[in-house]
């Protein structure tokens, strides 16, 4: 009887499935058909940001701390390809938020217990003329959070500040 919310923003069913899809890409060999076969397609994958060459330059341009030779060879190929270079930034997640515990204590605001579980995944894929030249992934494979709010006065807890503020 307590509220639940499910947030799905990925075609992948799990973090490992998303990781496997990105790890399966072979730089300098995998092409658009491989990406589509693995379920990686900006037109089908929600929350995919298509990056222009200028976006990629802003992310990887060498700075005082990072020299050109420190960059991955695939990134260098992409930067040198100029307008032939495109990138996809993929963000996916499956998050379940549920209030658990005693219905009466929750309803009367004495105690609320919220559990958040799931995963978050992000990946960056760079392509030159439709061929993958670089891929990287990261994220949170397992989210498990518990939040407990206790109000000793229950529904009366918020009345005190309301009375003080009206004077």
Region annotations inferred by a language model:
Residues 1-167:
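Residues within mature, well-folded domains
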């Amino acid at each position: 009887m307590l509220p639940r919310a499910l947030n799905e923003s990925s075609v992948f069913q799990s973090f490992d499935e998303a990781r496997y899809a990105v790890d399966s890409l072979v730089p300098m060999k995998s092409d658009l058909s491989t990406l589509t076969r693995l379920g990686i397609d900006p037109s089908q994958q929600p929350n995919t940001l298509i990056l222009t060459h200028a976006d990629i330059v802003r992310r990887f341009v060498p700075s005082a701390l990072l020299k050109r030779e420190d960059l991955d060879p695939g990134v260098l190929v992409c930067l040198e390809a100029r307008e032939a270079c495109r990138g996809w930034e993929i963000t996916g997640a499956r998050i379940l938020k549920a209030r658990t515990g005693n219905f009466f204590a929750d309803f009367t605001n004495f105690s609320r217990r919220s559990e958040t579980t799931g995963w978050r995944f992000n990946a960056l894929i760079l392509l030159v003329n439709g061929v993958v030249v670089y891929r990287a992934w990261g994220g949170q494979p397992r989210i498990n959070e518990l939040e407990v709010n206790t109000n000793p006065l229950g529904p009366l807890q918020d009345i005190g500040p309301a009375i003080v503020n009206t004077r």
